[in-house]
Amino acid sequence: MKIRVPATSANLGPGFDSMGIAVSKYLEVDILEERDQWFIEHDLGDIPNDDSNLLIQTALRLAPNIPAHRLKMTSDIPLARGLGSSSSVIVAGIELANQLGHLNLTDDRKLAIATRIEGHPDNVAPAIFGQLVIASQIGKDVDYIIAPFPDLSLVCFIPDYELKTSDSRDVLPKQLSYKQAVAASSVANLAIAALLTGNLKKAGRAIENDQFHEIYRQRLVREFQPIKRAAAANGAYATYLSGAGPAIMVMCPNKKKMAIYEAIEQLGLIGQLVSLELDRQGLCLV
């Protein structure tokens, strides 16, 4: 049995901590034979291969009596880059407990558990459901909408350095004034409405006019402004920080994808430039 969870790109500008899409990079976990102690085969560097791994910790949190197994974990989701690496592991851990513990969890229950562990639903929701998910957490309650995503292309630049979410949150203001909050939420409302109605030019303007986090975080990602300028000059709808960064996502018309890809490539930045697709399936068994 194999568990597969997609990478995610959260926020989409002003949808701070509440909106995200699933994209075509994946964490996969093969559930192999039972053994006396947990063991994870992987080639992912300094990640633990025993029961101190977040994957197994998450599973045991839900089902402490499930038998230990040998697991094989593979992933092309880069760590601490703003593509939901920790969320994918949490969601996979929940499904591991669900399968081995025969918990029969609904997707809604998986989302509630994942949100409680992660702290907000913007990554874990699209990791579970795929597509574009807009979610709200008030207390313990998590409400969400799985929404159609426009037909467009995604080009992502992944810098070769990590940016931990905790460090990225440290640059945010502790509070916004009432006037600032109203302005920021109006931009978010417009971005969502424009995405859902297919008005991608207005969606792009709203995404790039985020007032919640990107205006504070972009100075941590030196590649952001050069990529944003190059993408805009070649017809992109919007450029935004994926999650807490440092990954940078460009939304563009399908016919402009190659021109934008080449323009970013010509900047000579150090990192990985990839073309991504929307993942429509989310968490699944394969």
From Swiss-Prot:
GO MF terms, alphabetically ordered: ATP binding; homoserine kinase activity
Residue ranges of the TM segments: none
Pfam families in the record: GHMP_kinases_C, GHMP_kinases_N
Domain of life (superkingdom): Bacteria
Chief location bin: cytoplasm
Class in the EC hierarchy, top level: transferase
Documented EC number(s): 2.7.1.39
GO biological process: threonine biosynthetic process
Binding of ATP, residues: P78, L79, A80, R81, G82, L83, G84, S85, S86, S87, S88
Compartment(s) of residence: Cytoplasm
GO cellular component, one term: cytoplasm
Keyword annotations from UniProtKB, A to Z: Amino-acid biosynthesis, ATP-binding, Cytoplasm, Kinase, Nucleotide-binding, Threonine biosynthesis, Transferase
Metabolic or biological pathway, per its Swiss-Prot or TrEMBL entry: Amino-acid biosynthesis; L-threonine biosynthesis; L-threonine from L-aspartate: step 4/5
Reaction catalyzed: L-homoserine + ATP = O-phospho-L-homoserine + ADP + H(+)
Family: Belongs to the GHMP kinase family. Homoserine kinase subfamily.
Function: Catalyzes the ATP-dependent phosphorylation of L-homoserine to L-homoserine phosphate.
Name of this chain's protein: Homoserine kinase
